[in-house]
A protein has these predicted regions:
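Extracytoplasmic electrostatic interaction patches
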Residues: 84-148
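A short, amphipathic beta-strand motif
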Residues: 33-39
Length: 148
């Protein structure tokens, strides 16, 4: 009988010690926003055909007028604007993407930074592109913006 009680105590201690601790933390960085801007009539990238120069691109936060960091990738006639700053925290962003001080389109994103099951990640609740026609290629994660 004494052994049974000790055995039960040992089992109950063992079971109460089991927690859902995270031995491995995981993190998935937010997906960047990538934009290829093309001529609506020809479908040709406006930086590849030299209609515009990338040095005249501005990304402006419409909330406070501040400039937003971005990258411009220009390799082998692949000219893409990339914004990597969205989704690192829970936020709503409203950006104006401009070339030569002309607004090409606006980007609205409702982003949520979450931690579930020991993993941190971003969820985009809403994404809106306004003032331009566009297509989204889910496989490439690329928005093609059509301008006149």
């Amino acid at each position: 009988m004494k052994k049974s009680i000790i055995y039960l105590l040992f089992i109950s201690l063992f079971l109460t010690n089991c927690k859902n601790d995270c031995n491995k933390l995981c993190f998935t960085p937010p997906e960047p926003f990538q934009f290829e801007i093309v001529d609506a009539k020809t479908g040709i990238n406006v930086f590849t055909n030299n209609t515009y120069e990338s040095r005249y691109i501005k990304v402006v936060n419409l909330k406070d007028g501040s400039r937003v960091d971005y990258n411009f990738i220009s390799e082998n006639n692949y000219n893409v604007l990339t914004i990597n700053t969205i989704g690192w925290e829970t936020e709503i962003v409203n950006y104006s993407i401009q070339i030569d001080d002309n607004e090409i389109f606006t980007l609205y994103v409702d982003a949520e930074f979450l931690s579930e099951n020991c993993c941190s990640f971003s969820r985009y609740n809403e994404i809106k592109i306004e003032n331009a026609q566009y297509n989204y290629d889910k496989e490439k994660g690329l928005y093609t913006i059509f301008i006149n």
